[in-house]
Structures are given as structure tokens and as C-alpha cells.
Amino acid sequence: MATTWPPRTVIRKSSGLRTLESALQRSGLGPVAGVDEVGRGACAGPLVVAACALGPNRYESLAALDDSKKLTEKTREKLFPLICRYALAYHVVFIPSVEVDRRGVHVANIEGMRRAVAGLSVRPGYVLSDGFRVPGLSVPSLPVIGGDAAAACIAAASVLAKVSRDRLMVAMDTQYPGYGFAEHKGYSTRAHTLALTQLGPCPEHRRSFINVRRVATRSNGAATAEREADPPQERDGTG
């Protein structure tokens, strides 16, 4: 039986970072855009989603591209302006913590991917997503297992999202001192858990996450008990 192209099922990492995109381009399905997110598992800060379409002749200029989690911070920062310069189009979306709480992480992730693709200044012929399907896109799409290490456009989107979020979390560390956002970027490290317990949650913490909810519940309970223990206030007048 002949194999149809593009495939209709989830595919796994190809033999090279640009193999899949090149095949799609040769099939007349370009430009190919990749979409990826950062901050899905963090208990504070936004979920950041980026979409990026790379030109077929720009791969050599971005030879260091890889899954952003495998790159050093220095390499990511070096790649960020290069991706912005050489991309056909890119768009970064920030989903705030309150929206993550309201929608749930997965639904917020899907919505962020839709917004990121819709925000591209160049309409892609095909979209590759990292790991799971993105329903509701206006163009054909395909999920790629380990996509940020399998397709250059997804790797580029991963770097854009990661650097954008990291920079925001460093700024947030100044806005909400004491939590250590510049270090752990909102993830549930031991230091973050200790700070959260001591300070209580700030407006950027995700109340839908159980560790934040537990601290918030304890803080609210302690505040209620303190109010109940306060003596009656003196009042002027007759009674």
C-alpha cells in the first residue's frame, strides 16, 4: 500500500533536525511553521507560546539550533536575535497565570498555540507542533513527538518562548522580591516552595496548582483566625 504524505498520525523524531521540514517544503506545503510552549509545569508566571516559520535557505545560519532545554542560557540568548532576524515570521504569546487557572493548563496551551499561529505575519502552509495535536488551526498540522529536537522550526519556537519567558521572570523577580523568580523561573524548586510558604502566593502564582492552593488556603485560614482573635474596636458615642 502506498504511503500518503503528509502522514495523518503522530510521528517521532526524524533522522535530522531539518529532514521533516525539507520533505514538507518539497511537497509544496511550505512555509512550515513550528509551535512550542514553555512554562507548562511552572506554578508561577505565564505560559508562553511561540510560533516560528523559517526560510528554507536560513538553516545554515542557525546551525546551533536544538531543543531549548538542551541549550545553555548563553547559547539561547545568542540564538534569539538570529532567529528573529532570519525567520520568515514569528509570534510570541503570553498566557497569564489567571487565564491558566481559569482554562486549565492544557486548554490554555492549545489556545496559546492557536493565537501564536494566527499571529504570524506569513500564512504557513503547514504547522508542526511539539507532541500533541492543536485542533482549530486554519492550516494542516501534525504533532511531532520530541518535536523541539526533531524539527528546526519547532526548535526555533522553543528558543523564542524560553528566552521570552526567562526574561519576563527575571523582571518579575524585581516586582515580587523574595520568591527567587530570577533563579527558578516559577518552577517548584525547594527554594521556591520555602519562599511560597513564608511569603504566601503573589498575584503571579497559579492558584489551580495544588502546592499554591494549599499555601493560599493556610494563609487565608490564618488571617481569618487572626481577625477573630482581635479585640473589639472602641467606638465613640452613646449606647
Curated annotation (Swiss-Prot):
It is found in: Cytoplasm. This is Ribonuclease HII. Its cofactor is Mn(2+); Mg(2+). CDD domains: RNase_HII_bacteria_HII_like. Keywords: Cytoplasm, Endonuclease, Hydrolase, Manganese, Metal-binding, Nuclease. Manganese or magnesium. Binds 1 divalent metal ion per monomer in the absence of substrate. May bind a second metal ion after substrate binding. One of its GO terms (molecular function) is manganese ion binding. Its EC number is 3.1.26.4. InterPro entries: RNase_HII, RNase_HII/HIII, RNase_HII/HIII_dom, RNaseH-like_sf, RNaseH_sf. Endonuclease that specifically degrades the RNA of RNA-DNA hybrids. Residues 225-239 have a biased composition (Basic and acidic residues).
